[in-house]
Amino acid sequence: MAHRGEAGQAPENTRLALTRCIEDYLEWEEVDVRLTKDGKHVLAHDAVLRSGTNAELTIAEHTLEELKQVDLGSNFAARFAGERMLSLAECFALAKGNLNLYLDCKAVNPEQLAREIIDAGMEKQVVVYDQLERLRRCHEVAPGKVALMAKWRPDVGPPSWAPSNHLVAVEIDADSITPEICRAFHALGIKVETKNLGDWDRPAYWDKSVAAGADWIQTDLPEEVMAHALWQRIKLRPVRFSLHRGANRYAPENTLPAFEKAIRLGADFVEFDVRTTSDGKFYLLHDSRLDGKTDGHGLISETPSSIIAGLSAGVKFGRSYAKVGLPTLDEFLNAVAGKVDLYFDAKAIAPEALTAALKRHGVVERTVVYGSPGFLAKIKAQDPRIRLLPPLGSPDELEVLARDLKPYAVDTDWNILSRELIARCHALNIKVFSDALGKHERVEDYLQAMDWGIDLIQTDHPLRLMRAIELSTTRKDPTSAGAE
């Protein structure tokens, strides 16, 4: 259950935060609900709204129309400028059929809220969390039709307290959950959600909640919870995966936070791009220009490292990453060596420098290098242990690549993938990698490629690929994935 949406990647409680949950195939999101001066329910955690110009508006003292004028995005990042407050009606329209909602009622009209849920046809997708007095008012308007949930602690009474107050679920702090508590509530037909925020939002407490039998985990790290749980259930993966420029969906691409996130998500490989500055230093950057992903300007090849070192590589992603810079190749290798395999996209670096860096950090045998056949031939001459990954744009190119380069794998255009081509590659002792970037980032596409025998999928959407991995594993052995 994502707390205020994917609030680490988009402004909390906004359309963008909800949309990201839907795109990641998350099942539940927690949102906060308040009432405006003109009686409209809106999504907001704090009672006071702060705009990109630092203006402050008390939600209960302003109309929805007035609040809709406030820019909620600029404080997060300039790319979100113009993001507006979401009404509950708009939230329901977006979530219907796509995302279940935990409504954390900060200041609502209970009777009106119950009617709005029913009128929107959201009874089966919503649970309302509030104090008991307001929950009773919801129940009086729609007895048995709207799911109700409240906080439970041992001092409020035995588990029978929940059904006696018309609740269908309870929230319990993650440090208090036990198997005995869960079993007692489940015996009464009551679901259990654990609040795993703050210091409790880490693997030890996630495991504690799962082991206790919790039905939901509320978290600010839904992507990590999902990955952590999946890899405990699935030990033998049907395919390996690489995260493109690191976990670029959750942190700025080609930065240390993106690669650290990728490792926590269980990536087999991280892909990264290397370019050279005007004074011969090596930095991670995809584009030839600095303008796209940093606050710098111009070509990196015409910029000295003294300038590069002072740039922000994160401010355009989100202001919380404003102090994150472009890592040097050595900084990157120091951070990840031995933790994950490396997919080295040699954008602009001499073969000799590339080989020397891999040797210096002891990662020669954990690296594949992507580049043109001519460039890779030079790498092979430097050190034949380095695994080579040339592009394969046409099946007709395969035999020549196999004969002249003897690559470890080929980076195959997704559009030419087939069972027959993959079998041909395997017969030549060549693995098949492919980028599912863009239009092929779909569960059905991943599943087809896995069925054909692909060895590695590169993705920008790890949770989508994980969904496909779980489906593939379950179809082959319904008992192998286990129960959540």
What are the language-model segments listed below?
Residues 1-484:
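Phosphate-group recognition and catalysis centered on beta-loop-alpha active-site segments
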